[in-house]
Amino acid sequence: MAGLQLAPHLPVGVMFPHNKTEAHGLHSAKHDPYEQSDSPQRSSMGHLRTSFQQKLWSNTELEQEDVISTHPKRNICTKARRHSCPHSAGISQQGSGNNAQGQGKGLFYLSSPTPRYPKANDQDFIPFRKKRVGVDRAYPLKPMVHRKSHSTSETGIDGDQNGYPRLPDSSEFSDSSFGLRSWVNPSLLASPQAEKVMAQLHRTEWTQIQRLEAAGESLQKEIRRKEILLREKLKKTEEGLRRIQREKKQAIFQEDRELQRMVLPRRRVRDGDLDTTHNSCLSPELRSEVFSRNRGEDQTCEQAQENSSPLQLSDYEIQRLKRERLMVSNNKIRDRDSGPSAGTFSQPAEDLGDELQASSLSGTPGSSGSSSSTEEQELGKCSHCGRSFLSLRLQRHSTVCGKMQGSKRKVFDSSRARAKGTELEQYLNWRGPATDKAEPPPRKSTWRQKHESFIRTLRHARQVQQVIARGGNPSDLPSILPAENPDYVQCPHCSRHFAPKVAERHIPKCKTIKNRPPPPRRHDS
């Protein structure tokens, strides 16, 4: 055991190769010092070490396969490892006796001069991670970046021992330095994932935009449909309003036509007299101007009637009738101003009847004084109401007025209404109608006496207040006279005054009380 030499301590950053053959060669290269020795102990330790490393390698491979099967997203890691593992195929160890420091370190180097970081085709490399509790495999945590500050001299020393760049340590595959301290550039790793995320975002945005456009088109179609419906409704309402207006105009036109038929014969007679009086007042120049204007209006109206529709004709007829009515009303006002008898001439025959004929005979403009005198003589008074009427109307009024004055309102008898349908009704009918009670004479108004007595009481109360304020005795003042009310009745037994109805109840009671015999005296025992 004294001559036993332990194997140099392996560094933590040893990377196991992908192929088992390479691993076997590596292990054999590692354990050359033990095999060269002739002692059986060294050979047994070497075999144990190799078997242990083989078991460890198989376990790590199984774990990696499980991770890949459970998380398909990590296939990228296998790709990166396949790209990177061939570079570590030719691993050798410095076996010279002079370079003892190299054997003590036990560092492995690549057989080919590969750079420290892989090329651009290794962008998809993502290092493996061991299973941990509480870590989501689908959404791994963001790795922690711990950059080591290696000097250029150290790297040069490590790399110049064999002239080859150093392999990365196994700590670079640890969970604390996930992804960013690996052989692959992190910006190159993030680019495909970012592209996928951006493509997915663009796809979702495009679908949302398409949905919004479809919704907008559907809204526009709905708005157009509603606009069409509203326009149709407006057209229907406009047509209905126009139809109603036409019906109204036709009704007005028919009414005016009927009025024109009724008024036309009267107006012909009246217009003849009015035209003569009106033209006599006008000068010849004005008369010719008015005649030419009326003639032009008639010609234009005839042309309009020929070329226009029935509705336009009705409008023209309405305007013409209105103008004629205004002329008639002006003529009536002028006739009233000229004389009172003209008003009787313009009254309609339906209202006056025979009276209009009698008044029209005496209603000539030349006999205005005689007509007023005859009207005064014909007036007579009604015997019932005392109003004055014409002799022609007085008889009719007197008959109606006599009926109104003679008819009295039937008084409602509540006792008969209650007794109706009972045996008491026969008794009331046999008894006959109740005799009307004699109405009491009307009372005389005594408001002045009441007012004077009220003023006297107020003055007496004011005097009493003044005496009390001075500190005197109010009993020294003369007593106020009792208020004299002539309506009140004095009781003969107690000499008090009561209202008439109250006195009727009080006097018999007071009489019985006063006429009672005195109570018997009590004999004291």
Swiss-Prot record:
Residue stretches in coiled coil: 207-252
Binding residue positions for Zn(2+) 2: C491, C494, H506, C510
Residues that, per the record, bind Zn(2+) 1: C382, C385, H397, C401
InterPro entries referenced in this protein's UniProt entry, alphabetically: Znf_C2HC_C3H, ZNF_C2HC_dom_1C
Polar residues bias: start-end ranges: 36-48, 301-312
UniProt keyword Zinc-finger present: yes
Region named Disordered: 23-48, 85-107, 145-171, 292-316, 330-349, 356-379
Low complexity composition-biased segments: 90-102, 359-373
Record carries keyword Mitochondrion: no
Signal sequence range: none
GO molecular function annotation: zinc ion binding
Stored PANTHER family: ZINC FINGER C2HC DOMAIN-CONTAINING PROTEIN 1C
Family: Belongs to the ZC2HC1 family.
Name assigned to this protein: Zinc finger C2HC domain-containing protein 1C
Species: Rattus norvegicus (Rat)
